[in-house]
């Protein structure tokens, strides 16, 4: 989560969904260090906690988040774990994606809807004003900025380089991810694409 009072915004950061990029861009725009926008107490929040975090002044803020295709997000998480060097989260570079999924490695990345839903599993919280899709962030970022009353360009930070996510999956692992992230797939209208 990052928030600021001028302009008044709160970004609900979902891991592996361009959170570092959004934080960096907004920190640069405001002219502060990105850590100043990220209170450690509320690094990742749930939508139901927004009123508490903002002292019940959520109506004064533009609240947004970014979602991502669950299959692509899982591949990104896998590569992230291979890059970090902090046990116990680091993952050996020789581990195959399919073996990692079959062993349940993906379960370390919670569902997006678990953070975005309020009372019902498939209903985005009424506290969230806008949900951008990572796949269209270039098109959607100007809308986000307009709603905050600012102008700044999006740039990607920590973008992982890998082949198309669909190349990582066989039918079995594709189904594992679908079952685990079913609410994300169904509620956020995602599908597995071979593009």
Question: Which residues does each PLM region occupy?
Answer:
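Membrane-interface amphipathic segments in extracytoplasmic regions
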Residues: 1-195
């Amino acid at each position: 989560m990052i928030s600021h009072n001028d302009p008044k915004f709160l970004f609900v950061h979902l891991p592996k969904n361009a959170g570092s990029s959004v934080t960096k861009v907004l920190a640069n725009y405001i002219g502060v260090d990105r850590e100043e926008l990220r209170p450690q107490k509320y690094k990742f929040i749930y939508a139901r906690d927004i009123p508490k975090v903002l002292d019940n002044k959520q109506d004064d803020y533009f609240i947004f988040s970014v979602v991502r295709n669950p299959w692509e997000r899982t591949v990104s998480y896998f590569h992230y774990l291979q890059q970090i060097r902090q046990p116990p989260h680091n993952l050996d570079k020789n581990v195959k994606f399919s073996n990692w999924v079959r062993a349940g490695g993906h379960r370390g990345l919670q569902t997006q809807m678990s953070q975005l839903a309020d009372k019902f599993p498939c209903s985005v919280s009424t506290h969230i004003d806008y949900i951008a899709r990572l796949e269209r962030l270039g098109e959607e970022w100007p809308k986000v900025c307009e709603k905050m009353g600012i102008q700044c360009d999006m740039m990607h930070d920590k973008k992982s380089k890998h082949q198309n996510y669909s190349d990582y999956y066989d039918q079995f692992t594709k189904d594992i991810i679908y079952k685990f992230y079913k609410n994300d797939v169904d509620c956020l209208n995602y599908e597995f694409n071979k593009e």
